[in-house]
């Protein structure tokens, strides 16, 4: 049987950042169960699509969520990131 999930790693990373905006990429990856390298790639994807903004906080990065960005075709044009985060309890 093929392994699948309801929420992609992109959604899980977005949720992890929402709950822990000052965490390192390594810590975020550990929360989700993926490598630090994969986490960096997903963070870049989320930043490129406008879901998050990354800023420096000392030697670390801090992340801000842009909850009004549409989720795209999967959830319909009107669904926003804030609805997904709300469903996940964040």
Regions found by a protein language model. Give the residues of each.
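Short, hydrophobic-biased segments on the C-terminal half of alpha helices
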Residues: 43-44
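Key DNA-contact positions within bacterial/archaeal DNA-binding proteins
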Residues: 37
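Alpha-helical residues within the helix-turn-helix
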Residues: 27-30, 47-48
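A short, conserved structural fragment
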Residues: 47-57
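Short, cationic-aromatic polyanion-contact patches
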Residues: 2-10, 24, 56-78
């Amino acid at each position: 049987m093929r392994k699948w999930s309801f929420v992609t790693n992109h959604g899980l990373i977005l949720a992890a950042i929402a709950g822990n905006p000052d965490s390192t990429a390594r810590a975020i990856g550990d929360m989700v169960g993926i490598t630090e390298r994969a986490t960096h790639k997903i963070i870049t994807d989320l930043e490129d699509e406008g879901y998050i903004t990354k800023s420096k906080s000392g030697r670390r990065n801090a992340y801000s969520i842009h909850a009004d960005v549409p989720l795209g075709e999967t959830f319909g044009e009107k669904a926003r990131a804030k609805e997904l985060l709300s469903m996940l309890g964040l």
